[in-house]
């Protein structure tokens, strides 16, 4: 693959997840220089993430909404960005909401309960970027429910090991190879290494 005359592809979990779900437009958009208009739900999620980060920074704890657990040595979103070279044709990038020692924390909004994310590859992708993490916590707030309703707040934990790391690498390389081939075959091969429009 490295000898095909095209550059390496840089991917993130969200790009690969879009590809895996068949949302080709969203997966290809960063390489085509197309900005996808954020949905109302995405805008709401962004605002909540900003508010939760501000609260956690100020008090050194998880947001009260998620139990207020004391954080030991937290790093927040901008300080957690990582890019990792997996081979000569694939780079993986990502940003955690919170990295607290060997614990990764991801905030979610929307109707999906935390337990459903355990079936995703998200925690395995982030383990590739942060090999020292031992557990990945999903903290979810379903703003479609009232605070007192069951399911308003859900939390799920994925425990990470050598097997999850191997599984994650296999998935990333499989999805990235498919996406890279699609981009090359559809006239975007020259965009692979430019980095324009990649998630920050």
What residue ranges belong to the model's regions?
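Active-site-adjacent loop/helix micro-motif of nuclease/hydrolase catalytic cores
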Residues: 112-119
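Conserved catalytic cores of phosphodiester-cleaving nucleases, focusing on short active-site segments
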Residues: 94-112, 126
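Short loop/turn segments at secondary-structure transitions that flank enzyme active sites
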Residues: 54, 111, 142-144
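Hydrophobic/aromatic-lined pockets within catalytic cores
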Residues: 56, 109, 131
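Short acidic (Asp/Glu) and glycine-rich catalytic loops that position anionic groups and cofactors
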Residues: 28-32, 105, 151-153
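Metal-dependent nuclease catalytic cores that hydrolyze phosphodiester bonds in DNA/RNA
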Residues: 1-101
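Metal-dependent nuclease catalytic regions and adjoining charged, substrate-binding loops involved
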Residues: 6, 10-11, 73, 80-88, ...
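An active-site-proximal "capping" alpha-helix that borders the catalytic cofactor pocket
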Residues: 120-131
